[in-house]
């Protein structure tokens, strides 16, 4: 009976030990399998996250590139439209290109101030345009000569006292211009060089008057506040016109500012 007891006890101990070994081996195998599964899952998750980030970065890069190209095209189209408008308004090609990018454009200075230079403009305004529209030869040929013909070469006093055919509106001057260009009409030798020079000066004085008739009836005008070394410069323009281009308020007629002159104001 004691043998049977010990035999049963030994079988129980052996079975328990064998079961423990089996359970330990199965647990180790399960842990290894679970570790491998977790490692593969983490690798797959990292790979997916990296791929997603690369795709997102590539998408953002393409979108930014598309926005840059669209912005550049829009800016180019706007500059082309602005340049076309400036060209249509009479500005030169160089000034239209400058104005399309808001760069400084060529300005003209006359007795009324500065304005943008648009030589091909149809109308002269305060902001843009040329000085005046030159008169056509067809309108000039119908006018009659209202002055006496020019004398021959003589002394300067005789030229200054005697009336000469210096008007641009005379038939003789027009025929002289036609003769020099087309080879017909009165030759250039019909007028003396002094008479032709005086005719050219009067032509400039007439065509360069922007807003006031006779505003530029001047000879070798020295600009206001200039330091010209020439002593023969003279201006026949009134002082109000000389000072009209200054942007500051004109205090010339106020007693308190009698001895004060703004920068650029004439002292004649």
Swiss-Prot record:
**Keywords, sorted A to Z:** Capsid decoration protein, Capsid protein, Host cytoplasm, Virion
Keyword Repeat assigned: no
Q: Where is this region: Disordered?
A: 132-199
- InterPro entries documented for this protein: VP2 (IPR004278)
Indicate yes or no for the key word Ribosomal protein. no
Name residues in a coiled coil: none
- Renumbered to this chain, the Polar residues biased-composition regions fall at 132-144, 164-178
Q: Where is the composition biased (Low complexity)?
A: 145-163, 179-195
Where is it predominantly found?
virion
Subcellular localization(s) per the UniProt record: Virion; Host cytoplasm
Q: Name one GO cellular component term.
A: viral capsid, decoration
Q: In UniProt terms, what function does this protein have?
A: Minor structural protein that forms a portal-like structure at a unique three-fold axis of symmetry, following binding to the host receptor. The channel formed by VP2 may allow the delivery of the viral genome through the host endosomal membrane.
Q: What does the domain comment read?
A: The N-terminus domain points away from the virion surface.
What quaternary structure, including any partners, is listed in this protein's UniProt entry?
A: Homooligomer. The portal-like structure consists in 12 copies of VP2. Interacts with capsid protein VP1.
More info: Translated by a ribosomal termination-reinitiation process from the bicistronic mRNA coding for VP1 and VP2.
Family under the similarity heading: Belongs to the norovirus VP2 family.
What's the protein called, per UniProt? Minor capsid protein VP2
User: From which lineage does this chain's organism come?
Assistant: Viruses, Riboviria, Orthornavirae, Pisuviricota, Pisoniviricetes
